[in-house]
């Protein structure tokens, strides 16, 4: 089995694992790497099948998490953005002793809309899966454009995301399909009631993929967690609002 691409950066006394979202790779953290690197030792990861971690097929959430855990430090803050938030959450469930704190960014324990639960309509996720086989490149670009809609810097932020995708090898259709399948089917709402490490949830007020309506629902479901909504951010707050994003992580670190 191949190894995944993993880079360590920075010299802070606290380890921080950064997990990207669907279709992307670790270059997405480029805009905050310098700032965070002076406070943390960063672990930049390309998830299995993405970017430089080629040679992997589609995986379940559990398989993906197990693969990432092999390379991970004994103790770290785990931060996951979007799909990466599910991987970080699964790590907190399976290896709680190794997760100093859990941070999810523009992520949902259940991305798919269910009865009484806001989310992405399953037929939209299914449509993306269908379109992937028809026009792979265009489907990924559409998904990226959705992530920045509504922000003051939407066009520029979408260009940033596109350049991240193009900077590394594109994932196979099978891998992208597997990622959409995770987004469509996984539901960790009940399971995450049981995590007891510090748990920070960051959201963008304008996010079109993870509706802000889930925030009060999860505040009630997970009273041990803390939530913060960034007023003018959409699905990629670390790109549109890097200073506020980094500040939230420094505040978390100082509380540990």
Swiss-Prot record:
The main place the protein resides is cytoplasm
Which class of enzymes does this protein belong to?
hydrolase
What is the catalytic activity of this protein? 6-carboxyhexanoyl-[ACP] methyl ester + H2O = 6-carboxyhexanoyl-[ACP] + methanol + H(+)
**Where is it located?**
Cytoplasm
Q: Which GO terms describe its cellular component?
A: cytoplasm
Tell me the GO molecular function terms.
pimelyl-[acyl-carrier protein] methyl ester esterase activity
- Catalytic residues at 82 (nucleophile), 207, 235
- GO BP term, example: biotin biosynthetic process
InterPro entries, alphabetically? AB_hydrolase_1 (IPR000073), AB_hydrolase_fold (IPR029058), BioH (IPR010076), Carboxylesterase_BioH (IPR050228)
Q: Name one Pfam family in it.
A: Abhydrolase_1
Give start and end of each AB hydrolase-1 domain.
15-242
Pathways per UniProt: Cofactor biosynthesis; biotin biosynthesis
Q: What is its EC number?
A: 3.1.1.85
Q: Which UniProt keywords apply?
A: Biotin biosynthesis, Cytoplasm, Hydrolase, Serine esterase
| Annotated binding of substrate, by residue | 22, 82-83, 143-147, 235
Which PANTHER family does the record cross-reference, listed alphabetically? Answer: HYDROLASE ALPHA/BETA FOLD FAMILY, PIMELOYL-[ACYL-CARRIER PROTEIN] METHYL ESTER ESTERASE
Under the heading NCBIfam families, the entry gives: bioH (TIGR01738), PRK10349.1 (NF007674)
What role does it play? The physiological role of BioH is to remove the methyl group introduced by BioC when the pimeloyl moiety is complete. It allows to synthesize pimeloyl-ACP via the fatty acid synthetic pathway through the hydrolysis of the ester bonds of pimeloyl-ACP esters.
Q: How does it assemble?
A: Monomer.
Report what the protein is called.
Pimeloyl-[acyl-carrier protein] methyl ester esterase
State the species of origin: Salmonella typhimurium (strain LT2 / SGSC1412 / ATCC 700720)
Q: What is the lineage of its organism?
A: Bacteria, Pseudomonadati, Pseudomonadota, Gammaproteobacteria, Enterobacterales
